[in-house]
Amino acid sequence: MVSQHNEQVIAVAKLFDGEQWHHNVQVHVSNGKIAAISPADKGLVTNVALVPGFIDIQVNGGGGALFNTEPTVSALKTMVQAHAQFGSTGLMPTVITDSVAVMEQAADAVAAAIAQGEPGILGIHFEGPHLSVPKRGVHSTTYIRELSEAELTVYARNDIGIKMVTVAPENVSAEQIKQLVALNVRVCLGHSNADGATVQKALAAGASGFTHLCIAMSPLTSREPGMVGVALTDANSWCGIILDGHHVDVTAAKLALLAKPKGKVLLVTDAMSPVGTSQTEFPFFAGKVTRDGSKLTTEHGSLAG
């Protein structure tokens, strides 16, 4: 690698640009961004592959830190470092259903990290608290609630990067979704038992994505499309999907890839604190979560990220 001031040239054996592989190339970096790609002398290249980093929009924790429990800049740094080991270079730290106080602390931490120029923090994802109790998954019923001014004040902030909020459209009206969109919030649908018509209204109001497709959402049946059916057939929205071998069957994942336009299916981890550690259990609200290999479950056997 050749470096001069804010200019760098990196010669590699293989480069993936997101569409195709390039061989024996040098990458010209200017002020932290790729400016050009050109052929390189084979004698100069290093025998490595250079690929774009992963962007994960649903990250609850990592490195032993859980963002709900530790809504701090220090925890964010720990999470970023843990996920960087596995190729993720941009994260949306995720706060699941919790008190307004925790949401405010998490927003403060993200704002401070961004202001300090901490790498890897793209914004914040609030997964809840405006969800469906029947489809809550491991979210605490104690904190599931309607949208109020207290949460809107958090969502209105302009210092927390990209803002994403997952809601159940049967509990958050189309007008409220429009209000969130007007605040530059990316509204996602999930943890919902809504019928197809309600989901369609939410999309028309400005919702643009679905949180962990097939998990904790109304299913596709013969006479009711549910949230899953609408998600698969709507060409404009995107779907996050957890492909860890536990959450979604591979056939369902193939169906999503066949049904959705290119670029509309996103891999997410829904990662918890054990990422990058040997941690085998951790406290989770009033209970605990246990790790068995790559599988996390609550004391009641429910999947937990």
Where are these regions (language model features)?
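N-terminal metal-binding scaffold of metallo-dependent hydrolase/deaminase domains
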Residues: M1-A40
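Divalent metal-coordination and catalytic microenvironments
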Residues: A13, V27, G32, N47, ...
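Divalent metal-dependent hydrolysis catalytic cores, especially in the metallo-beta-lactamase
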Residues: N60-G62, K77-A106, P119-S132, D159-E170, ...
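Active-site glycine- and acidic-residue-rich loops that bind
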Residues: S99-Q105, E170-S173, C188-N193, I242-K254, ...
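Divalent metal-binding pocket/active-site signature
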Residues: F126, S132-E149, V154-G226
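Active-site-adjacent C-terminal substructures of enzyme catalytic domains
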Residues: T198-G305
